Regions:
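Central cavity-lining transmembrane alpha-helices of secondary-active solute carriers
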Residues: 55-73
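Pair of pore-lining "gating" transmembrane helices in MFS-fold secondary transporters
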Residues: 8-40
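Intracellular juxtamembrane helix-capping segments at the cytosolic ends
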Residues: 123-138
Length: 176
């Protein structure tokens, strides 16, 4: 196995790093995947109308536009590990807060939560994630690293969606 890893520019430590980066990235974006998997049920779970959900979803474009300047600045000024840790904790805490207190959160609180989550995930995490991936192997194997990363995220997204579908089925099936 070690020979195979070395052939593709990895050491056992950097390959393990790639696995952790992939798992962290997918867990970070799991909240958004659930939103996309259950577009009708997600606003209902938050206790908002479809129009209010549109306001929340439009935050993504706003945060990316406003945060574009910060993307490079933050990534070059601070440690990748610190940025990824802060981003993961921020998104995790906000996701937990929304999960525990919805429905019932006011629209301004939900807007602040979505803005903060997008700031942590899109403005802080994404550039640090790409930088960590790029530094995990040599220049000759960058495509492989990104391919493995996206493959891993796809597998994890499938498993999370399968878990989500199973939870919905067992919640709804007894009522049918």
């Amino acid at each position: 196995m070690k020979h195979l890893l070395l052939k593709y520019g990895f050491t056992p430590a950097t390959f393990f790093q790639l696995i952790l980066i992939t798992i962290n990235a997918q867990l970070l974006y799991a909240f958004w995947d659930i939103r996309n998997s259950v577009p009708g049920g997600f606003p209902a779970a938050l206790g908002v109308t479809d129009q209010e959900a549109g306001y929340l979803y439009s935050m993504q474009g706003l945060v990316i536009l406003v945060g574009t300047i910060a993307l490079g600045w933050v990534g070059d000024r601070f440690s990748i590990r610190n940025i990824m840790l802060l981003s993961s904790l921020g998104v995790g805490c906000i996701s937990l807060f929304i999960t525990l207190f919805s429905p019932g959160l006011s629209m301004p609180v939900l807007l602040a939560c979505f803005f903060s989550m997008l700031f942590f995930s899109e403005v802080l995490f994404k550039p640090a994630n790409f930088k960590a991936l790029r530094s995990s192997t040599s220049e000759d194997h960058q495509g492989l690293v990104f391919g493995l990363f996206e493959f891993g995220r796809g597998v994890l997204a499938f498993l999370i969606s399968l878990l989500w579908a199973g939870m919905l089925y067992y919640q709804v099936a007894p009522k049918l």
